[in-house]
Amino acid sequence: MSINSKFTINDVLLNIESLQKKNKYSCPICFEFIYKKSIFQCKSGHFACKECWEKSLKIKKECMICRSKVNSINDLSRCLVIEQGFGKKECYCIYSFNNDHFIDYANLDENITLVKDKENGCKEIINIDQLDRHIQNCKFKFVECSHNGCDVVLRLNSLKEHENQCGYKLVKCKYCACDDTIQKELENHNNECPKFPIGCPQSCSIMVERDQTQSHINNDCNNSTIQCKYYEYGCKVEMKRSELQNHLNNVNHQYFMGILIDKLSSKLIQSHNIQDELVKKIEQSEKNQEILNKEYDQSKVICENRSKIICDKHVKKIEQLEKTQENLNKQFELSRIIGENRSKIICDKLVKTIEKSEKNQENLYKEYERSKIICDKLVKKIEQLEKTQENLNKQFELSRIICDKLQKQNDQLLSLNALKYKNEWIISDYSKIVKKNPKGSLLNSPSFQVNQNNFLKSQSLCNILQNIFHLSFYQNGLSRINKIAIFLMGKSIEGTNVEFICKLVNVLDETNSIKFKTQKLKDIDDLEWDWSWGRSYIIDSNLITQENGWLTKDDKLTIEFKVKIFNNVNKPLES
């Protein structure tokens, strides 16, 4: 019987030869030891393992030794004395051998000889009934190293020591704190580690981190060659950084300091002038903003008044419909009263006729039939009037729904009459244009038109309003303050409001693109163009570079834009 896929009970039993000679603990049929077998016996005491009994009983219903009758396994009794006696026999642990039997058994030579590992193997002698529990907890069992990449197989009691020294153990660099380096590659890592301390390449005897070497040379190293701090102002001496203080102490730099002071004073004056100009422009912008706010408020009031006029008209129509319905109700009530009075008069006449002419029953009957016909007609007329009233109620409800729809249509008039134009302006060779005009320049896009056609079904007339536009791009803004400005310039746009949506495209990251929207009219002093829409301060002009994503590899700047024209003037239809 196998202990596991590598060992049988025969491999570990003590005194196996003695047990084999006695045959007391072997099945007399299959001749195997009764390890992990259920033993059954007949009434005469002849025993065998359960597997052999089942095979034999399929052929003959009798004991294999004494031939006594046995119908099934249920006629047999369990032989616990033999099972328990074998469980008390002693054996070795399977981990008392070396690990040759613990390699991949698919490639194992079946004839390999078991070798005792006297130095490192398990030395315990165990009862057979305790073998499974011991194997599970044995400290001498073979295990694999837990570190990724290490194929070492060793005993459990030496695993901890091995894993601490294993070359595949992940270690943390004490310089850069990275923790994904294995122990045997730590030296190679130190040769590349950006935080590993190395000597200055200019031999200044200072240890610096590898990635800070250039910064040390540029800013701190005493052996670096530097220029005099007044180099730009006339002192053209170069020296080591350690000699700078002696140079400043020994050489008179008052003349060069005077030049520096003059330049700083000049820049300070220019800065004050620029500041004054900016203040003026800000004040002018605030005034322009107030004007735009007033124009917006006026436009808002006009729109509200128009909506109110339309609503008032619909309210009057509804009131007229209600009056019409009220008149119809009165007419219906009057008709009903007239019908009742006529019926009463006819009935009275019939009664009198009956009282006066009891003898002439046939004539009375005819008169009665006539009055019945008249009543039927009156009933039909009443039913028609009721249907008329129901139709009027439906018309009233329909009028209310139409009024609501007209209100919604009025709210959508601006968007329905709007003209839309979408395009993009690509400025090629942007960097070259900037170099040619370092102080800033104005770039104008090609002109474009936004057309509107109003077709009237009752007339073969087409009114075309041509709106001419172009985009103006100011490299340094309107006031040369190193801020990009973009405006839409409009012509022939009398009686319209314009919405201008512009996006400065970032080709590296779309989320960094700058988008703005204007819908306010702005009067400008240009005699050629009537109106303009845009923004003065979009982005610093010096940020428009390929590295920042605003320019493509072939030096192009892309501006996407949309133009909407809302026509607020609706002329009445005439036919």
Swiss-Prot record:
Q: What does this protein do?
A: Probable adapter protein and signal transducer that links members of the tumor necrosis factor receptor family to different signaling pathways by association with the receptor cytoplasmic domain and kinases.
Q: What's the protein called, per UniProt? A: TNF receptor-associated factor family protein DDB_G0290965
Q: Which domain of life is it from?
A: Eukaryota
Q: Which organism is it from?
A: Dictyostelium discoideum (Social amoeba)
InterPro entries xrefs: Sina-like_RING, TRAF-like, Znf_RING/FYVE/PHD, Znf_TRAF
GO CC annotations on file: cytoplasm
The text the record gives for the protein's domains is: The MATH/TRAF domain binds to receptor cytoplasmic domains.
Report if keyword Kinase is assigned.
no
Alphabetically ordered keywords of this record: Coiled coil, Cytoplasm, Metal-binding, Repeat, Zinc, Zinc-finger
Q: Which residues form the MATH domain?
A: 420-563
Q: Where are the zinc fingers (RING-type)?
A: 27-67
GO molecular function of the protein, one example?
A: zinc ion binding
